[in-house]
Amino acid sequence: EVGDIPMAPRERRQWGERLGEISQRWDAGDLDLRELHLELAALLRGFAEARSGEEITTATVSEILDMAATAGPSSVEERRRSVRAAGRPLDINPLGHVGELLAVWEQPSFDREPQAAGQEALTHAREVVTRW
């Protein structure tokens, strides 16, 4: 079972500051949607590793989903399909939620309006950093 390591307020603030820097670069037009997703994915992988104590930064999305307890389908592939169809994470388990966000961000974003998709990605990342 994956741990849930408490995080000091100062450390959580540092993760929030990193997220703020990414958000500023997005707002300034320095990142396209793909670059934003890659930066947010790296940030959330590091955050999830700090919270879980598990090697998340190098794990695949499938490995992350496999190690996270879930209230949803037990099959990783079924979870990926459900999340991609919904276009958003469905799991209430924090690590599962991160894994599902990564799965959504892996998908090509040609069918989404980039500005709205970017703001949605930032909102989801902010929720993880402030609530987990």
Predicted feature residues:
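Membrane-proximal, non-transmembrane interaction modules
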Residues: 24-132
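Hydrophobic, helix-length membrane anchors
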Residues: 1-25, 130-132
